């Protein structure tokens, strides 16, 4: 196979192997960082390039609706679920295909199909993977993922009328969309122009959703919308809310709680809070306890690398060791209960003594019916 080396070794690798071309191929990175890396490669003697969707996207025999974003944690998954519901209401068979999360044995993960919770265990899914697949399973939607996206597409086409691309990070779609929906975040105004390849998604999109309008300042909503209109004047722009509900919120009213949030949203997404904090506030908890002073093992390293996450607990669970560190940190933190803002049922993967209540969130259109009309215009 192709050897994997740290990015810090790129200059040495170019010089040692006489590399002619370096290709930048990952996502959710500030434009400035991309160009600093480009400068290193150019100085070492290699050309530097990025690949466009025209050269990377696969074409499906079925209609494709793609959901992407400008940053991690904007609300792609809830939007994908909402669109899947609208498509099913049209009597269409919908299959979601999720952007890859390649951990473990990649050959064994070439094509993965998830239709039941047992499939999550069979494929030994990480917490991050479960966060993406569980909500689809709960909604009765089959979801595919893996490594070989040509094989995945051809298998998904056998049981779908419509393919729903559920994007990861702020990456480009792997499949050529008939309708490209991109989400922007008014809680991070300006990021729609600052991150690669999120800006490309905005410029490519047929329809842009300004999400979380219920939590953002009106001036930031207006600024983000104006920014989108300047970059892509032909795109439809829809404003949506992301209301948070807490199941069993009365159980944590007046209590000291730990808030567990979606890991990627806090790490490379750079957020300081998520649905858990919003839900905890709505449930009138007494106090959100900062778990970072009690973090052990890999979680202590996570806080050191991402200090913005201090105050809440990122649900890092890419290995059994990280899950044990998560459990130990929860047990060591002096709190009465846990408010979970992750999309999964933590009780399925964690064993802790503190009770857990879930904060969940869904997409809500400010002008109901517009997304259905956009689907109808493409699919009939």
Question: PLM features: residue spans?
Answer:
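"Short basic amphipathic alpha-helical interaction patches in structured regions
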Residues: 36-38, 80-83
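Flexible phosphate-sensing "switch/lid" loops adjacent to ATP/NTP-binding sites
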Residues: 15-17, 65-68, 78, 85-229, ...
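Phosphate-binding P-loop
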Residues: 57-62
């Amino acid at each position: 196979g192709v050897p994997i080396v740290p990015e810090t070794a790129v200059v040495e690798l170019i010089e040692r192997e006489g590399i002619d071309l370096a290709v930048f191929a990952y996502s959710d990175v500030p434009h400035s960082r991309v160009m600093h890396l480009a400068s290193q490669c150019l100085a070492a003697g290699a050309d530097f390039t990025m690949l466009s969707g025209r050269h990377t996207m696969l074409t499906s025999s079925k209609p494709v609706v793609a959901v992407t974003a400008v940053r991690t944690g904007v609300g792609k998954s809830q939007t994908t679920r909402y669109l899947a519901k609208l498509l099913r209401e049209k009597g269409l068979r919908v299959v979601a295909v999720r952007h890859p999360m390649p951990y473990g044995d990649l050959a064994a993960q070439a094509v993965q199909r998830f239709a039941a919770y047992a499939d999550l265990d069979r494929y030994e899914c990480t917490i991050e993977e479960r966060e993406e697949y569980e909500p689809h399973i709960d909604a009765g939607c089959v979801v595919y993922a893996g490594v070989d996206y040509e094989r995945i597409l051809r298998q998904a086409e056998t049981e779908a009328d419509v393919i729903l691309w559920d994007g990861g990070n702020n990456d480009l779609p792997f499949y050529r969309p008939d309708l490209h929906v991109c989400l922007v975040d008014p809680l991070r105004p300006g990021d729609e122009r600052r991150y690669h390849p999120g800006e490309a998604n905005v410029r490519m999109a047929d329809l842009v959703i300004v999400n979380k309008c219920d939590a953002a300042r009106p001036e930031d909503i207006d600024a983000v919308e104006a920014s989108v209109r300047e970059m892509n004047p032909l795109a439809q722009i829809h404003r949506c809310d992301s209301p948070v509900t807490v199941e069993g919120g009365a159980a944590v009213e007046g209590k000291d709680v730990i808030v567990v949030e979606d890991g990627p949203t806090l790490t490379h997404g750079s957020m300081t809070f998520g649905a858990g904090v919003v839900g905890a506030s709505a449930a009138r908890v007494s106090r959100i306890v900062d778990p970072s002073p009690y973090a052990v093992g890999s979680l202590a390293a996570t806080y050191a690398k991402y200090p913005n996450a201090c105050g809440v607990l990122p649900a890092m669970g890419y290995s059994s060791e990280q899950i044990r560190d998560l459990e130990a940190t929860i047990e060591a933190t002096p709190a009465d209960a846990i408010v979970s803002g992750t999309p999964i049922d933590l009780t399925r993967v964690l064993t802790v003594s503190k009770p857990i209540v879930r904060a969940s969130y869904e997409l809500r259109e400010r002008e109901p019916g517009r997304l259905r009309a956009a689907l109808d215009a493409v699919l009939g």
